[in-house]
């Protein structure tokens, strides 16, 4: 028999205790953003360079840091003392500027920073390649240093040189990624625009050691930036795609070329020159976090399987005269174990033969990979 309505009791079910993702407030306090003294001090830095000073001050205060280590690439070191003065003035921390050469985010040297007593580190000008949770014992902040450019001139230049409907791949360094995204959005109504991505890098960002492979239908790759180091990376990865460079400083647009045949011939010659070598030198890079022990161990196992002996050396940078002192390495065959795919192009300007990991793998297996992408990932961390 069904219960009468007077005997029914309505029970409200409890909401399940499901915790959502933890949210951390990332809003910079108004008292920092509107600090007139701080804003006046920031004017000592170039207006078109975003050093994220407000965020830095907030993060240093939030962490209650006592000593802040600043790491900048050579092109930004001229601003280091100004930034250090601002941090010391508006926080309770003192600062130190790290003097070792910094080629990229793989050079993040949290080990040295900790040894110098720093409990907070700011790395400028590069992507977050080393995760902030990997730097144990020290707080980490990456500042990309976004640089504002004349985007209108860049767009006018591309529209003048390429007819509508063309397929264009846009790439740059991290400093110009924001400008690249703005340009991509403006060009899409008239062009097929591709902003390629190589994770964990940002869309459109390339490194001297890492670039994406593009589809064959891409008519041209446009590099926004100065110099050729990063540009050559994507040219090596895409030998059949015409490459152009727009220099945002000089506003010069140029067609760029790379001698792929000479590069491959050099690689083949280096491989053949080592066929009779019995003892090899393996260098583990100690500049920041460039050296990869897993790659080193992998190469050692490969050499052992071939019955080759080796000498292991730790170096922050390669100095040919120092390597010449180690005469027990046959034919001076050295392998530099670091995260730099460009080392797959052997050095020919010095008497010592220095190889990258990719080229050594080819040498100790077979010649089939001669034309392979020179900066492919061989061994993960």
Swiss-Prot record:
One of its GO terms (cellular component) is nucleus. Its EC number is 2.5.1.108. GO terms for molecular function: 2-(3-amino-3-carboxypropyl)histidine synthase activity; 4 iron, 4 sulfur cluster binding; metal ion binding. Keywords: Cytoplasm, Iron, Iron-sulfur, Metal-binding, Nucleus, S-adenosyl-L-methionine, Transferase. Transmembrane segments: none annotated. The keyword Transferase applies. The keyword S-adenosyl-L-methionine applies. Its cofactor is [4Fe-4S] cluster. Pathway: Protein modification; peptidyl-diphthamide biosynthesis. [4Fe-4S] cluster binds at residues 106, 209, 344. It is found in: Nucleus; Cytoplasm. Belongs to the DPH1/DPH2 family. DPH1 subfamily. Component of the 2-(3-amino-3-carboxypropyl)histidine synthase complex composed of dph1, dph2, dph3 and a NADH-dependent reductase. This is 2-(3-amino-3-carboxypropyl)histidine synthase subunit 1. The gene is dph1.
